[in-house]
Every structure is written in C-alpha cells, then in structure tokens.
C-alpha cells in the first residue's frame, strides 16, 4: 500500500495553524464540544429518514467494539466491513449480519468498502494507513469517522488536514474520536478557564502511564504486528507510544493552553523487557509556548503493575485545574473553584457521544467539522515531542512543519 503523494499546498495551509490567535483556537475547541453534547432525540429524528449506511474498516479490539455499537445504533446500518485478516472480517460480519460478499480483507479492503457505496466509513486501523484511507473516502464522497492519532508523521498529518478541509468544502462530516472533549466535566472546567478562573497560566503538566502492548518478535513480514495492538510498538505503524497514547493528555493540555507550542526538548528511551520493535516507551518532554507558558509531558509504558492514569494539571496564578481521563476533573482556587465530578466510563461514553455527534452532523447537515484542527494540532504536538527526544535537541513547531520525511513500511509479503 503506497502512502498518499506529497501535496505542496498543505504546507501553506498547515503553517496557518501556528499563527492562529488564542481566541480562534479556543473558539474552535469550544465548538468541538457543542456538537458532541446534543440530545440523541434531536440527533435521530425519524429513523426512516436518517438511517445512514456505514462501513467499518479495522475490526480488531476497539474497531470490532465500535462496529457492534454502530450496528446497534438506530441511525446507522452497517452494510460492509473490512479487516486485514479475512477470518476477522467474516466473523464480525457474520455477527453483524453483513452479507459475506461485503466482508472484505487485505490491505485494500478499505477500498472495497468505499466502492460498495456506503454513506459513511469508520476507520479503526493502525494510523499509518489513515491518510490514504481518509483521502480515498473523502474523494468518494463518504463521511469519515476516524480514531486518533490521525497519522504517524508530518506529511500524513497534513494530508488528514487537507482531507478534513475538503470534507467541509464538500459538505461532508469528518470526525476524529477524542473522548475527553465530549466529557461534560471537562467542558465545564474549560469554560471556567476561558472565563479566567485560573488567572495567568504558569505551568501545564500532562501525563500518561499504562502498561505496554504485546511486542512480538520480528517475522518475515510485518503481519504479526497487525494484531492485538502490537503495532503501537512500531513507530511507522503506530507513531510510537507518545503519539498513540500520550496524545489523550497532550490534547487536553493544548485545549487548556488555547494554543500550540513553539518548541520542545526532551528525552525518551526503551525500557520494556525484550523490546522487539523501535517505539520508545518512556518520555519526558518540555514544551514552550509563545507567551512563556511551560508544559511538561511524562509517560511510561512498561509492564510493571502501574495502574492506568492519564490527565493534565494546569497551574495558574489563582487556581489549579486537575483533569483526569476516566477520573475526576475539578478546580481548586484561592477565591473560586469547581467541584466537577468523575467520568469513570469515559472510554465508552465518549465514543458513544462521538458516534451520536457523527450521525447528527450527517442528518442535520452540520459539516463544520470542529474536531479536525484540534486533532491535527494534538498529533503534531506529540510528533514534536517524539522528534525532539529522538534528535536530542530543541525542535521548533516551524521546523516540524517543514519536515517532509515519511515513515515507510516494508509491506512485502502482505495480502493486498
């Protein structure tokens, strides 16, 4: 499978992201939450008039789980599925009552789903493949729902930006599935931040700690990496742990900052036992913003019994915000605070709200696609951190945007 060709127009358009004002960034982030928090009753209307034909590409783990939810959703009808592995495609297809002739496999199974004339497509494959898949879906006139991160390198990320903007121009919906931006406690806390409850920000700290995924020995092909999230251990397939996992926390930090960083420095290493693939799993990154705000991001992914925890702390001159993925979000201050609350089921609830929002956008013609630019910015920020650590020096945002190098995979021997 070839990567999408480079488009020189993307560089100018992406550079605009670095010069957007704080107000524009916050407005985009705020609108990203509005669409996802509407009543399902408003979203669905008449089932006969709003049922959308859908295809799901990537059916292992989260992809299969999302496919089951979409199949039960009153607004969608799954008419095609695809997975690299034919047995996975057929097993899920049988469970969802998809005809055998519409259960596709191989690297190009996504194209068969698109060619089956679905209205919408859900992309849940390793992110290396997202730019090509999303571009093909948008060119075919499909609405696109995709996982994060949006890509594994800068050219791929900018390709997603262009595909998303093309969707908007074509009056189609393009949604990236970040769960925290749908959480009512995060939304309310961020509204209070905009109103000034924290005062001037001094420090942001984001973090993500969890165990690593299975890291199988290398084989004759990379097929063994396409199962059980093993691809997260491969930088080209999954972007590396900082891009694939830490992005949840980094995205919240950017949401709070209302801007993108101007530079990053950092360190990273591989500490998981018997590492077979190249992704680093321990990171300590420092980001700087143009207004002097400092942000640190730290994470580790080793099987050492550490319980999952991810979130962000924001320290201002008047108060401190604590925002946890699946935990409590609150603000403590010298004058004012916010009791907030917990969202222990955010992983599932966030997905459900995003699927509802995707359907609502399709049937109501809401195609401003507010999740696009925040998701692109979050991906670029994690790429900035990854590259600063790998290069062992300071890397600026502008340096990053000039990076035309694509991460390449040897797809020899894989089923097309």
Protein language model features and the residues they cover:
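Beta-strand-loop-alpha-helix segment that lines the small-molecule cofactor/substrate pocket
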Residues: 119, 131-182, 196, 392
